[in-house]
């Protein structure tokens, strides 16, 4: 397998260099030439080090760090050029499918970099949140209207992130526990989680923020107008954000603090804080500042909730589904994935106060009693330590 990944990595980089060279020769301006030269040098050096099978000495690791930084830029330029030039439907679909696995051979060479949790977080965010596949997929010319939302919504990028995350964490020795049975779960607790999921989803999307009583029990469904684009945007958020924050980040922090008394609480707190802060990027999409701050706080709190459910069930799909349900109904009721403008006073409306209390109290409940004991047991199974230390 390692030999195949090595030659895949080399071949992919050589193809990237050829495409960038051709793109600059065809370009009317030279604006991309400097960055293309830098990227070409980095890729050629990476190929050379891989061919020579150099040991990961400090200078080599420093170079690999810059290579990891440059990779999504290379992918973006290559895919942007191909997306604009390709007219063949079969080739466009082939390129879309290849985007799902394009990070795998690069990960093979950069795995020593990802053993550092700081690098793991930095490059996971850079590759699949700020840059990389999600921003590339919309540029592909997909002629079928029914398929187009899969790419314009960023959903295709979330699938690429899933493939990347599974390969990364398995390479580092972590287990994907979704495929294994979980024992000793309380039927009562699972029923409560299920009922809370349904009620919270409806409350979040349709609650009428009039007074303290109506806000709890009166729902308005008149604005519910789902579209394929909003649906796939919600699926993208659920799949991508849970894999990134609950699978990569949470498990990494659990391993770092495996000898700490408050291992679970610390891992949940820090991974949820990162999850919340990532939503600051919505400012770049034109979202209101106060609304974005509100979303950050909400995301941190829901991070507590989703982390506790994930660790209790041991199944990532449970929180992916919960996240998708929340976003599908919320996006379809507002007609947008962005929040409306808010004022400071809006923080203290019945709706927002209840939202805060629901998330906080449910998370505290999940992290106490017999549920906490089951979480401790599951944490021991969620990663399998290899001979090499993944931290």
Residue ranges and their predicted role:
Residues 3, 51-59, 111-114, 171-176, ...:
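Membrane-interface capping segments at transmembrane-helix boundaries
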Residues 4-22, 39-45, 64-78, 101-102, ...:
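Alpha-helical transmembrane segments
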Residues 4-6, 16-30, 317-391:
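C-terminal membrane module of polytopic membrane proteins
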Residues 8-10, 31-45, 88-102, 149-162, ...:
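Alpha-helical transmembrane segments of polytopic membrane proteins
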Residues 22-30, 82-89, 93-96, 104-125, ...:
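Juxtamembrane helix-loop-helix connectors linking adjacent transmembrane helices
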Residues 43-62, 79, 103-111, 165-170, ...:
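Canonical alpha-helical transmembrane segments
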Residues 240-270, 311-315:
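Membrane-interface helix/loop boundary segments of multi-pass membrane proteins
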Residues 264-283:
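Small-polar-interrupted transmembrane alpha-helices in polytopic inner-membrane proteins
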